Structure formats: structure tokens, C-alpha cells
């Protein structure tokens, strides 16, 4: 019999405590719990890993080697599994050739559509290019009324310079009498002299015909002769009216522009047949950017305003610049912005043909001198970039280059032949520029001829179906040409979700990791109905999620806890959402039922008159936005997905501040100016990127507390006696580390066809250090024992050392008391990595002049984690600093001092500021979707707080 549930027995992956779980099949199951409690360990590292592994085991050993190794999870048994598909956030392609269209395969169908029913047009003349038979030409000409006079002409020269004596001589020999030269009739018996430096067009008059009955045979003979002479082209001059051009080849009759047979690869920018030859199908070209070459125009040339020519070791370029300035009389002590344009142009673009005297003396006193042509700083960088064989130089030069739209294909990525094929007046590049919603409307209303409709019917059905799936999961604002690398984790995941809905599989186990990330409350219902739709096809969905709406919509809810890390790993409660809400042990249940909640702040901070202000922001979809962010407050930037939040904050504000305050090289998005810089001295972006890419990086090394701990060990009597310095206690350098495993503690053994096996090092038994180093102890513990301690244990262990205690306290405050100091960075979740970064900021001394930017800090956080995160963020603001978050989570938004709401819609329908002010002010704005969803939350929490106060008063009385 088919099992109606998945039984997991004895799961021990990571921090799971040998748990048994029962999951109903063909249901929407949500797994929730604190960050680090073991949700992903259960869903991904146990259930998915085993489902995938069993499926892959059925393939041949040859096929398995290409699929990557699947570890067997640490579990006793799992029954009732189906093949598993995981839709997570990690696997987005960063390849610049990947676009929303290619990832969803919509672009493949578009290519097919254009190859089958597209109409080629001449890019010069706009004429549709068709090939016609003589019968079709005759029929077209005989449409004219009777007695119409016309001439049949054979074009033999079109728009070419020369006297064309030989051509005319040849025609005369063939027995022709008349020609038309540049529109004027001439007899070949006359002396014809043409100016050889002018362009000429020559047509031979083959026949003169009057349209009447019985003329068809003569007309087709004349056309045949004309086509032979005109190499496949013929011109019909209807006297006193118009001229017709016919071609028997697939070519423009005027200029001969032709396209071979249309095939799908012609429209692929990843194939040499279709890609634009200038940018190789990327749509962008790296070009030297004058703004990056001279980032600060307030400096003079003497103060090294030309960034790439700042002297490092050699004085060659500074001396060359001096020679150029001497030659042209350019003042090197004046700020660059005050130099006349023609002088600055000489420095940037070179001296042309002028020769400049240049005398160069190197560090060894050797002298070279002579007259040289100066190529200009920009050309110099471009040349060095193209000619160098060294990756280092190429990277150096790339810092001064930026991506510009390709001049040949205007950013459409395809060669001109592909862009000359139109459907309904648009080429394929124009279609990919449309948002999903607009493209859907375009294809639904598309009218084609009956024959074309028959051919395109199936293709159109696929395109419309896929577009509507994207629309269903709330991605209607994305354009098909959007690069996949610029999508947020949630967007990428919802795209894959749409692709899966499109495949309409049944009986599959889908495992999703927080699909609601980056999704506004408004679009949440669409996502939930998409998930239910997949469930109704007969699939089991296991969703790791913290979103309240998704949890309430689940058929079955599993709460893992009670704490995080070593304090978690158990099933606290499982059942319908209502059953979990009733369970007194479940933290999630308490939040869902309202017994626990994040309170509103007693009062909101008032802006103190210090602002950072962006004027005229117009990158991506922003419509010349002017935004003000009050400093010294906790500010949230909100708006539906795709409204322009990340563009405004990350692309413009962060990059512009980093460029001005930290001399960063990244170029900010387009805007007029930014005011209020004098109130800040640093900007810090705290994102969820891993804190290190290797297992050697860990929370202790990242926060800098490991340095202090090594100092403590180096100060012990034993270390002093042995002469050990702090370097002895590092596992990254020779000396104190175990050399057998080079301080890793584990040794990797590569196995083909089987997962790589990691075994503890036999010499140090996983302790990373050699025996001598481990003999040095502090309070009875070796350096290796300290790395194995949790933050919580280390806090009490080092409580007498204020320097260490302060750093560990901040890790504990952000809710990371459960991680060990030596936990490899690669095993931390995104939320944990972000909190490690927050902690390392918290223990620094505050100046009150720092701006912290956090993009969706609630990703991966449970409501209880969010409560802790808020305490930390409010602490930063209490220190006088400014915190700016991009957020959809209403618990964060309701506690902000100030909100800037973008919208009203996503994509082209967004990019303006809908409202700004306190949360209460936002709820009063009709057009604001954020306000609409925030209002009931604020009212609900006010009621909750009142009843809490009442309960307290009753208790005290």
C-alpha cells in the first residue's frame, strides 16, 4: 500500500538530537523554529539529502560522477520518501549570460517563435524582406487598372562611385537602347559621361508595357530578362505614380541586405550565430570611465588626482604627466575641476599628432629621453588592460572601467540580422525589455495571419503559460532581460518555483527555504496559493518558513527548538497551526496566538534636523526621486517587490557614501547629488554574505576576539618559560599548529563515485595544534578547548578579562550564545553570519557618525530572533548612530522611527516615493500598500499592550 506519511527515525544531522518525525504526505508542511534550531538540518540535510541520494543511487556510476556527491545523512531510517527537489536560495547563477528569460526557458520559446513566424525587415529601409517568384510579381503588377503605363527596369549599378564606362559599353553590346541614370532617361547611342567622384544609380530599360488583357506572358518574359541582368532584382516604374522593387532572393531590393534562413540559434546571444560581434552577446562593454580615473575632482594633478597613475614604485607615469603638463602649460597645482576642458582633454585623451619632449630618469639613475606621442590616460589604461598577460594588472585596470551599454547592439545582445526580424513591429530584444505583466498582455492580444497562427499556436501557449506562472508567484514586475545575478534570493527562488509549477509533476517531494523573502505582504497571498496549487497536484511540500501567514496556511506545522544550536534540535510541537497555538511549550505557538508579541516602542525618536538627502535618483526604475533620511534614527525603506528599494539604498546611497567616505571604487547609480555627508564619517553594509569562504574562518577570528584570546595564552607563565609568542597559538601559520593536517583538524580523503570522506587528523585528533602548544593551559583549558566552547561558556570562562568579555557579550546579545568560537564560517546560516557582523560592530566604540545599512535583516529569523535583533539595532541608534533597513517584515517596520515607502507598484509602475514619515503617518496614506497592511498590525498591538497593562494592574492590585 502507498504510505500516507514520511517517517524519519533517529535524525542526528548537525544539532538534531536523535529525533523521530512524522510528516503527512501530499500536504503543505511548514517547519519553523529559532534561527539555528535545526530546521534546515531536518528539511535539507536529512530529508532532501536522503530523497535525492536514493534517486541518484539508481543511476549508473558513470552518470553519478557528473552529479556531485551526495552524503548519506546521519539518520537511522526514513520511510515513505519520494524523489526530492530542493528550491533554495543558494543556487542562483551569477553568470552574466543568464537572464530571467533564459532561466525560465521563456526565451527558448521566443527564439523558436521568431524563427518560425518572424518577418525579416531591412534595418535601413524598413521594408519587409521577402523573396518572390515571377508569378507573384506578375500578379502584383496586373493589379493596376487597365491602360496603366509602366517600364520594366533592371538595376545594374546602385549608389556606386565611378564613370561606369565598361558597364555602359557592355549593355550597349547586348543590344539595349535606353537606360535611366540617376532618375533621368538617356539613350545608349548618346555619349554618356558620368562624374567619377559622385555616386550613381543605373537601370536598364528592358521593356515598356501597358496593362491590358493578354500582356502576362510578355510581362513574365521581360521580368525574367530583367532579373537575370539585375542579379535577382527588378524595378517597375509605374509612369507618373510609384516605383516597385522586387527581389527573387531573400534580400532588400534597395540595398541588398539579406538574412539567411531563420533558425532559433540566430536569436541566441550565447551562440556565435546570433551574438552581437562587438560585445559577444553580453549587451555591455567594459570601457575606461573618466569618473573612476579622476574620482576626486577637488585634487590637483600634483596631488595625484589621476588615480591609476598614483606613484607606487616607479616614477614613470608621474614624470610623463609632468612632461605633458609642461608642454601644454597645464597648471598642476589647480584642482582638476578648475582646469579648462581642452587642457584636461589632452591629459585624458592624448596629444594626437603633437610630439612631446619626455625625459625619464629611473630609480637607478638611468636616463631615457626623446620626442614621443602621448596616448592619453584613458587609452593607456585600455591598452594595458588588453595587452597584459598578468591577471593582477588586468584587475588593477578593471577598477577604472565600468560597464557601458554596447554601442553596436544598444544593449540588446544580438547582431543586427537578428534584430531585423519583427513580430507585430517589435524585435525580440524589445519583447525581453517588457515586464512579465506587459509581455503577458502582448502575447494574449497578438494577432497573426491564419497560416502563422497555425504554426505559432503551440509555442504561444507555452509562452503565455510560463509568463502567467511568473505572474502568479508575484514576479510580474521583472523584465525578461533582467540578469539572473541581480535577483534577490527570494526572487530567484520564486522563479524556480514558477518553473516547477510549469512542469506539473505529481508525487514529488518539494523542499523550499523561505520563499517569502523579499516579498511584500501584498503579494504573500499569491505565493501561498501557488504553493497550495503545487500541493493539489499531488505533491508534498516541506517549507522552512517564519512568515505568519504561511504558517497559518499550512496543513501541518512542525516547531523545532526549544533554543538554537546545542539548545535546539528537538521537535517541540507538531500538528495543525491551531494545535501548535494551544501548546504551552511552543515558542512559535505563543507568538501565533498573541500570548507573546513584539511591542510597539513607547515613543518614536524625532528627527534632530540632521539628514542625508539624495537628489534626482534615476537608476533602473527610479523616477528622479528626492529622498531624505533622518540621521540618528531607526529608518525603514519599504515598498512592494521591485519598487526600487535596493536600487535607492544599495546602488546609490551606499555606493555614493562608500566612494566619498572610504574612497571605494564602485560607481554609484545615477543621481544628481547627495547632501549631508558632513554628518557621517563611515557607512557599513551588514549583509548576509558568509563571513569567510573557508572553514579556517570562524566567529572568533572574524570578531577579533581570537587575537585577544591568543594574547591571554601568550601571557601565561608556561608560554613565557617556553618563549611562545601569540603567533604560536594560531592554527593558520607554522609553529604551533599540527603540520599533519595544517591546522584544519580534519583530513579530506577523495573518493570517486562516493562522497569525499573527512576523517579527524590521527596526529592531533582534531585539535588543530601540536602537543607542545596544547600543553600551555589557562585555567586548565588549552587553546583548542577554548575554540570548542560555546559563546555562553566562554563568557563565564573569560569574565575577568574585560576586553574579551565585551566582544563575547555582544555575540551573546545578538542571540548567538549557542555557537562555538571555532565553528567554521561555512556552516553558519545567512542570519547567523549577519549577526556575527552586527556583533563585531557593536563592540566598537561609537562615534555617532556611522550609517549602518541592512538589506532584509530578518531573513532566516524567527519572531523571537527578530525581537532580539531589534534590541541590538535600537542599541546602535541609542549610541547616536543611524540604522537604515530595507524590510518587508511588519514587526520591524512598526518599530521604526521613520519610514520611506517606495512604489506604488513594482518595476515600471514603481520608482517614486509614495509616503514618508512615522509608521502612524504611513497608515493614513491611501496609496501606500505598506500602510494598508501596517494599520491592522499597529491597532492589534495597541490593543494587546492595553490588555497586558490591565493584566499587570490586576495582578499588582
Swiss-Prot record:
Provide GO CC annotations from the record.
Answer: cytoplasm; excinuclease repair complex
- Domain ABC transporter: residue ranges: 309-587, 607-935
Span of zinc fingers (C4-type): 252-279, 738-764
- Where would you find this protein in the cell? Cytoplasm
Claim: Thylakoid is one of the keywords in the record: no
What are the binding positions for ATP in this chain? 33-40, 639-646
Q: Which GO terms describe its biological process?
A: nucleotide-excision repair; SOS response
Which SUPFAM superfamilies does this UniProt record tie to the protein?
Answer: P-loop containing nucleoside triphosphate hydrolases
Which UniProt keywords are present, listed alphabetically?
A: ATP-binding, Cytoplasm, DNA damage, DNA excision, DNA repair, DNA-binding, Excision nuclease, Metal-binding, Nucleotide-binding, Repeat, SOS response, Zinc, Zinc-finger
Xref: InterPro entries: AAA+_ATPase, ABC_transporter-like_ATP-bd, ABC_transporter-like_CS, ATP_grasp_subdomain_1, P-loop_NTPase, UvrA, UvrA_DNA-bd, UvrA_inter
Task: List the Pfam families hit by this protein, alphabetically.
Answer: UvrA_DNA-bind, UvrA_inter
- Provide a Gene Ontology MF annotation, just one: DNA binding
Q: What is its main location?
A: cytoplasm
List the Gene3D superfamilies hit by this protein, alphabetically: ABC transporter ATPase domain-like (1.10.8.280), ABC transporter ATPase like domain (1.20.1580.10), ATP-grasp fold, A domain (3.30.1490.20), P-loop containing nucleotide triphosphate hydrolases (3.40.50.300)
Q: Which domain of life is it from?
A: Bacteria
Q: Give the record's family classification.
A: Belongs to the ABC transporter superfamily. UvrA family.
Q: Which HAMAP family match?
A: UvrA
Subunit-structure text:
Forms a heterotetramer with UvrB during the search for lesions.
Q: What does this protein do?
A: The UvrABC repair system catalyzes the recognition and processing of DNA lesions. UvrA is an ATPase and a DNA-binding protein. A damage recognition complex composed of 2 UvrA and 2 UvrB subunits scans DNA for abnormalities. When the presence of a lesion has been verified by UvrB, the UvrA molecules dissociate.
The protein, known as: UvrABC system protein A
User: What's the source species for this entry?
Assistant: Bacillus subtilis (strain 168)
Taxonomy of origin reads: Bacteria, Bacillati, Bacillota, Bacilli, Bacillales
Amino acid at each position: 500500500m502507498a504510505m500516507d506519511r514520511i517517517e524519519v527515525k533517529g535524525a542526528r544531522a548537525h544539532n538534531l538530537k536523535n529525533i523521530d518525525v512524522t510528516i503527512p504526505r501530499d500536504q503543505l508542511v511548514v517547519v519553523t523554529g529559532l534561527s539555528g534550531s535545526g530546521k534546515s538540518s531536518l528539511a535539507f540535510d536529512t530529508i532532501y539529502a536522503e530523497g535525492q541520494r536514493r534517486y541518484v543511487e539508481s543511476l549508473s556510476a558513470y552518470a553519478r560522477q557528473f552529479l556531485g556527491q551526495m552524503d548519506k545523512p546521519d539518520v537511522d531510517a526514513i520511510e515513505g520518501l519520494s524523489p526530492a527537489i530542493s528550491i533554495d536560495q543558494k543556487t542562483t547563477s551569477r553568470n552574466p549570460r543568464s537572464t530571467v528569460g533564459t532561466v525560465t526557458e521563456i526565451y527558448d520559446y521566443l527564439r523558436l517563435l521568431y524563427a518560425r513566424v518572424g518577418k525579416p525587415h531591412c534595418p535601413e529601409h524598413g521594408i519587409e524582406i521577402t523573396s518572390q517568384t515571377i508569378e507573384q510579381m506578375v500578379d502584383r503588377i496586373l493589379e493596376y487598372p487597365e491602360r496603366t503605363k509602366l517600364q520594366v527596369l533592371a538595376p545594374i549599378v546602385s549608389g556606386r562611385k565611378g564613370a561606369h564606362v565598361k558597364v555602359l559599353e557592355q549593355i550597349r553590346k547586348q543590344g539595349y537602347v535606353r537606360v535611366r541614370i540617376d532618375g533621368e532617361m538617356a539613350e545608349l547611342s548618346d555619349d554618356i559621361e558620368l562624374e567619377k567622384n559622385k555616386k550613381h544609380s543605373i537601370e536598364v530599360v528592358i521593356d515598356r508595357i501597358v496593362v491590358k488583357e493578354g500582356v502576362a506572358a510578355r510581362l513574365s518574359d521581360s521580368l525574367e530578362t530583367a532579373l537575370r541582368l539585375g542579379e535577382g532584382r527588378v524595378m517597375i516604374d509605374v509612369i507618373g505614380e510609384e516605383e516597385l522593387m522586387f527581389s527573387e532572393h531573400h534580400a532588400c531590393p534597395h540595398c541588398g541586405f539579406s538574412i539567411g534562413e531563420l533558425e532559433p540559434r540566430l536569436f541566441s546571444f550565447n551562440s556565435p550565430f546570433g551574438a552581437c560581434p562587438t560585445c559577444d552577446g553580453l549587451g555591455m562593454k567594459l570601457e575606461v570611465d573618466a569618473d573612476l580615473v579622476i574620482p576626486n575632482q577637488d585634487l590637483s594633478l600634483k596631488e595625484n588626482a589621476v588615480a591609476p597613475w598614483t606613484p607606487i614604485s616607479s616614477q614613470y607615469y608621474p614624470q610623463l604627466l609632468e612632461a605633458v603638463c609642461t608642454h601644454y602649460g597645464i597648471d598642476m597645482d589647480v584642482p582638476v575641476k578648475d582646469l579648462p576642458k581642452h587642457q584636461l582633454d589632452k591629459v585624458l585623451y592624448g596629444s594626437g599628432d603633437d610630439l612631446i619632449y619626455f625625459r625619464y630618469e629611473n630609480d637607478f639613475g638611468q636616463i631615457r629621453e626623446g620626442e614621443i606621442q602621448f596616448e592619453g590616460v584613458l587609452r593607456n589604461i585600455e591598452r594595458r588592460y588588453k595587452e597584459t598577460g598578468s591577471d593582477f594588472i588586468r584587475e588593477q585596470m578593471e577598477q577604472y572601467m565600468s560597464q557601458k551599454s554596447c554601442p553596436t547592439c544598444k544593449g540588446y545582445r544580438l547582431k543586427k540580422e537578428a534584430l531585423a526580424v519583427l513580430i507585430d513591429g517589435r524585435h525580440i530584444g524589445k519583447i525581453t525589455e517588457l515586464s512579465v505583466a506587459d509581455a503577458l498582455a502582448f502575447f494574449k492580444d497578438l494577432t497573426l495571419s491564419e497560416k502563422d497562427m497555425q504554426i505559432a499556436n503551440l509555442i504561444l501557449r507555452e509562452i503565455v503559460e510560463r509568463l502567467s506562472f511568473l505572474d502568479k508567484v508575484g514576479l510580474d514586475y521583472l523584465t525578461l532581460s533582467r540578469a539572473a545575478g541581480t535577483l534577490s534570493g527570494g526572487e530567484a527562488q520564486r522563479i524556480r518555483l514558477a518553473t516547477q509549477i510549469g512542469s506539473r509533476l505529481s508525487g514529488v517531494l518539494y523542499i523550499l527555504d523561505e520563499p517569502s523573502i523579499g516579498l511584500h505582504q501584498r503579494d504573500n497571498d499569491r505565493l501561498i496559493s501557488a504553493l497550495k496549487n503545487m500541493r493539489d497536484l499531488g505533491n508534498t511540500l516541506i517549507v522552512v518558513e517564519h512568515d505568519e501567514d504561511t504558517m497559518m496556511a499550512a496543513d501541518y506545522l512542525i516547531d523545532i527548538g526549544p533554543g538554537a544550536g546545542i539548545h535546539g534540535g528537538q521537535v517541540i510541537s507538531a500538528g495543525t497551526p491551531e494545535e501548535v497555538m494551544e501548546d504551552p511549550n511552543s515558542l512559535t505557538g505563543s507568538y501565533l496566538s498573541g500570548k507573546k508579541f513584539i511591542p510597539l516602542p513607547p515613543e518614536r525618536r524625532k528627527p534632530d534636523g540632521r539628514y542625508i538627502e539624495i537628489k534626482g535618483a534615476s537608476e533602473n526604475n527610479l523616477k528622479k526621486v528626492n529622498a531624505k533620511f533622518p540621521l540618528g534614527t531607526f529608518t525603514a525603506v519599504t515598498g512592494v517587490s521591485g519598487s526600487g528599494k535596493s536600487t535607492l539604498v544599495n546602488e546609490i546611497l551606499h555606493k555614493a557614501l562608500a566612494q566619498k567616505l572610504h574612497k571605494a571604487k564602485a560607481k554609484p547609480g545615477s543621481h544628481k547629488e547627495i547632501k549631508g555627508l558632513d554628518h557621517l564619517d563611515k557607512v557599513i553594509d551588514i549583509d548576509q554574505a558568509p563571513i569567510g569562504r573557508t572553514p579556517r574562518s570562524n566567529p572568533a577570528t572574524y570578531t577579533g576576539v581570537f587575537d585577544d584570546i591568543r594574547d591571554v595564552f601568550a601571557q601565561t607563565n608556561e608560554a613565557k618559560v617556553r618563549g611562545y609568542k601569540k603567533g604560536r597559538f594560531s592554527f593558520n601559520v607554522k609553529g604551533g599548529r599540527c603540520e599533519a593536517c595544517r591546522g584544519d583538524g580534519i583530513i579530506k580523503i577523495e573518493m570517486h563515485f562516493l562522497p569525499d570522506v573527512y576523517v579527524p587528523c590521527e596526529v592531533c585528533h582534531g585539535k588543530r595544534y601540536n602537543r607542545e602548544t596544547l600543553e600551555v593551559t589557562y585555567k586548565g583549558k588549552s587553546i583548542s578547548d577554548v575554540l570548542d566552547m560555546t559563546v555562553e561558556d566562554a563568557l563565564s570562562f573569560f569574565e575577568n578579562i574585560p576586553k574579551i568579555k565585551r566582544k563575547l557579550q555582544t555575540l551573546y546579545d545578538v542571540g548567538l550564545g549557542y555557537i562555538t568560537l571555532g565553528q567554521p564560517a561555512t556552516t553558519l546560516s545567512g542570519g547567523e553570519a549577519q549577526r556575527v557582523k552586527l556583533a563585531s560592530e557593536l563592540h566598537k566604540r561609537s562615534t555617532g557618525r556611522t550609517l549602518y545599512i541592512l538589506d532584509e535583516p530578518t531573513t532566516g529569523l524567527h519572531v523571537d530572533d527578530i525581537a532580539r535583533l531589534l534590541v541590538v539595532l535600537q542599541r546602535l541608534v541609542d549610541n547616536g548612530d543611524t540604522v537604515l533597513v530595507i524590510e518587508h517584515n511588519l514587526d520591524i517596520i512598526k518599530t521604526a522611527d521613520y519610514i520611506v515607502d517606495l512604489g506604488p507598484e513594482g518595476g515600471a509602475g514603481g520608482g517614486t516615493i509614495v509616503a514618508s514619515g512615522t509608521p502612524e503617518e504611513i497608515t493614513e496614506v491611501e496609496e501606500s500598500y505598506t500602510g494598508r497592511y501596517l494599520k491592522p498590525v499597529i491597532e492589534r498591538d495597541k490593543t494587546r499592550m492595553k490588555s497586558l497593562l490591565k493584566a499587570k494592574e490586576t495582578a499588582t492590585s
